[in-house]
């Protein structure tokens, strides 16, 4: 996973975003156990408290859940995962369209760039 962090956003927020992307893309499957806080902190090169905050955000959002001493797991609610995926896709499309508008691209120019 890419752990290069930008300076324009808190690291815990970027961790939350990357872990969400890993869940919706299937890197972490529904029901799969996530690496421990310490393992993620070492892998990402950040403080364990930062990872804990990111995982707490994911729990609050319902994408992961804790099982006392067993660790954290990805939700098995595939509708929740699908909704998170659509939310991310919608944000990215919005960013793309804003960039194209800033460049002065017309609707037809934008459509010609999209190859599905």
Predicted regions and their residues:
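N-terminal intrinsically disordered/low-complexity leader segments
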Residues: 1-8
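A short alpha-helical element within helix-turn-helix/winged-helix DNA-binding domains
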Residues: 33-44, 58
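Conserved small/polar residues in nucleotide/adenosyl-binding loops
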Residues: 114-116
